[in-house]
Amino acid sequence: MGKVYDWFEERLEIQAIADDITSKYVPPHVNIFYCLGGITLTCFIVQVATGFAMTFYYRPTVTEAFASIQYIMTEVNFGWLIRSVHRWSASMMVLMMILHVFRVYLTGGFKKPRELTWITGVVLAVLTVSFGVTGYSLPWDQIGYWAVKIVTGVPEAIPIVGSSLVELLRGSVSVGQSTLTRFYSLHTFVLPLLTAVFMLMHFLMIRKQGISGPL
């Protein structure tokens, strides 16, 4: 094993990278509330893992979606646990995100030179809420159906472009298969990809600028 490590060390300088990560200065004023962002990241990772597991059994069609959820909950080994963890971690992610935003705002972490870090954080907050909106509809039960109908109907109040926006969100004039397909694609591909990109930007800026000082 030593020779294998030395081979990689010679080419990648793993020890230097590890030293840089572990030797970063942490200000003395940092407390447990500064961990809220990391907890949010942990919830996102749990979401990705459990969500990926459910894609093996979930069927994104209006006729089979609800039945596939029932199958996951009653027939798949530990399916009930995987889906429950997915739901619990989703709620936890939203809660931790809100608390993290409050902590950053109250401690002035959005001020110069960290404006871009704050902006990427706001984008991540919007993406987090979008996860909730799109994921809520996927079981395609009565609650999910009417939630989608209400949410996608909101833009209709916008003058001129309202009807076009509603049709864009739904995929057609009314809520149906096209709507479920779009929400499933957003929830499982578009939103996770955007979230991963903005999280990377967010953490790289935090790494570069360090943790903000006390007020």
Swiss-Prot record:
It is found in: Plastid, Chloroplast thylakoid membrane. GO terms for cellular component: chloroplast thylakoid membrane. Heme c binds at C35. Coiled coil: none annotated. The keyword Hydrolase does not apply. Keywords: Chloroplast, Electron transport, Heme, Iron, Membrane, Metal-binding, Photosynthesis, Plastid, Thylakoid, Transmembrane, Transmembrane helix, Transport. Binds 2 heme b groups non-covalently with two histidine residues as axial ligands. Binds one heme group covalently by a single cysteine link with no axial amino acid ligand. This heme was named heme ci. PROSITE patterns: CYTB_NTER. Its cofactor is heme b; heme c. Heme b 2 binds at H86, H187. It is a multi-pass membrane protein. The keyword Transport applies. Its main location: plastid. Heme b 1 binds at H100, H202. The 4 large subunits of the cytochrome b6-f complex are cytochrome b6, subunit IV (17 kDa polypeptide, PetD), cytochrome f and the Rieske protein, while the 4 small subunits are PetG, PetL, PetM and PetN. The complex functions as a dimer. Belongs to the cytochrome b family. PetB subfamily. Heme 1 (or BH or b566) is high-potential and absorbs at about 566 nm, and heme 2 (or BL or b562) is low-potential and absorbs at about 562 nm. NCBIfam families: PRK03735.1. Component of the cytochrome b6-f complex, which mediates electron transfer between photosystem II (PSII) and photosystem I (PSI), cyclic electron flow around PSI, and state transitions. This is Cytochrome b6. The lineage of its organism: Eukaryota, Viridiplantae, Streptophyta, Charophyceae, Charales. The gene is petB.
